[in-house]
Amino acid sequence: MTNIRKSHPLLKIINDSLIDLPAPSNISSWWNFGSLLGICLGIQILTGLFLAMHYTSDTATAFQSVTHICRDVNYGWILRYLHANGASMFFICLFLHVGRGLYYGSYIFMETWNVGILLLFAVMATAFMGYVLPWGQMSFWGATVITNLLSAIPYIGTSLVEWIWGGFSVDKATLTRFFAFHFLLPFIIAALVMVHLLFLHETGSNNPTGIPSDMDMIPFHPYYTIKDMLGALAMILALLALVLFSPDLLGDPDNYIPANPLNTPPHIKPEWYFLFAYAILRSIPNKLGGVLALVLSILILILMPLLHTSKQRSMMFRPLSQCLFWLLVADLLTLTWIGGQPVEHPFIIIGQLASILYFSLILILMPFVSIMENHLLKW
């Protein structure tokens, strides 16, 4: 008699995805981030659901409702801070997951990679709209500045911005629709995750060497379920430490001031995970040019499979490419720092140089060095 997990229509899907799935025997802890992202999404949906039960998406009461959650709702404060810092954890895992994909050549699985980029955009959109909901100063002005960027689009720009706002400024209509979309998008993300996994399981996982591992596979359970549980434990521990010891470490103090359209904060900046893109946006003096650079800074990931000129898939045995990869990481950290600084000397020129280096590394230097390595190895 066949085991029920192998014959039952529903259990069979779970079995083929989480239990009997053949996985390479040599995948390292860098492969843990997929499951960690799944846990992050689960935490965000759960905490968000309970927060939505007490939140009101009205400009007159939104700020007060968040205060009410923190002060009067049982364990409301921990829900709110788990949700806010859970987003930061989500992005840490996302960046590491994408970085892993770049380093080990996972982008060769083009369908999985492209769905992943779509997921990245969806998560960024969700996080941006979520930041607007507490209706603090930075929420209001962040929403105003970022949505206003669309006015740089020729001909339809102004109409598009007013259509998104639902009026002539960020107001009640904007907050209500942002709340609606912020609630809806995580479920769309969950559906996209299923598609992402579907494409991944068509090809099987990559591994650190970049060499096909068909001849050396092990079952996902118990080996990688245990490994994922250890990663999850570490991440949840880090998240709880952040929430319970310094919940406002990654937030902006200006967001504890209720939104005031008549008073602009001295430095308008987004959450830390958008700062690298914000720095690229600010480094170009032209508005449309800046918006294009902002979009391309993420969209450039789509070109990765086309820019792969090496005969080897992974960077594991390519020291020159490794140097450029870590230079790219350092460059992104520099951009993140610059994004949080005021627009003045010397930050302007540092931001411009870091932006030029970012695009040069991905479009020119890394493909060129890969060709050079092929010649050095006489391939």
Swiss-Prot record:
GO terms of biological process kind: mitochondrial electron transport, ubiquinol to cytochrome c
Subcellular location: Mitochondrion inner membrane
Domain of life of the native organism: Eukaryota
Cofactor annotation remark: Binds 2 heme b groups non-covalently.
Matches recorded under PROSITE patterns: CYTB_CTER, CYTB_NTER
Chain sites annotated for binding heme b b562: 83, 182
Cofactors named for this entry: heme b
A GO cellular component entry from the record: respiratory chain complex III
Binding site for a ubiquinone: 201
Molecular function GO terms recorded: metal ion binding; ubiquinol-cytochrome-c reductase activity
Coarse class of the protein's main subcellular location: mitochondrion
Protein residues bound to heme b b566: 97, 196
InterPro entries: Cyt_b/b6_C, Cyt_b/b6_C_sf, Cyt_b/b6_N, Cytb/b6-like_sf, Cytochrome_b, Cytochrome_b_C_euk/bac, Cytochrome_b_N_euk/bac, Di-haem_cyt_TM
Record's keyword annotation contains Electron transport: yes
Topology of the protein relative to the lipid bilayer: Multi-pass membrane protein
Transmembrane feature ranges: 33-53, 77-98, 113-133, 178-198, 226-246, 288-308, 320-340, 347-367
Annotated keywords: Electron transport, Heme, Iron, Membrane, Metal-binding, Mitochondrion, Mitochondrion inner membrane, Respiratory chain, Transmembrane, Transmembrane helix, Transport, Ubiquinone
Function noted in UniProt: Component of the ubiquinol-cytochrome c reductase complex (complex III or cytochrome b-c1 complex) that is part of the mitochondrial respiratory chain. The b-c1 complex mediates electron transfer from ubiquinol to cytochrome c. Contributes to the generation of a proton gradient across the mitochondrial membrane that is then used for ATP synthesis.
Family per similarity comment: Belongs to the cytochrome b family.
Classification via PANTHER family: CYTOCHROME B (PTHR19271:SF16)
Note: Heme 1 (or BL or b562) is low-potential and absorbs at about 562 nm, and heme 2 (or BH or b566) is high-potential and absorbs at about 566 nm.
UniProt subunit comment: The cytochrome bc1 complex contains 11 subunits: 3 respiratory subunits (MT-CYB, CYC1 and UQCRFS1), 2 core proteins (UQCRC1 and UQCRC2) and 6 low-molecular weight proteins (UQCRH/QCR6, UQCRB/QCR7, UQCRQ/QCR8, UQCR10/QCR9, UQCR11/QCR10 and a cleavage product of UQCRFS1). This cytochrome bc1 complex then forms a dimer.
Name of the protein in question: Cytochrome b
Source species of the chain: Epomophorus wahlbergi
Encoding gene per record: MT-CYB
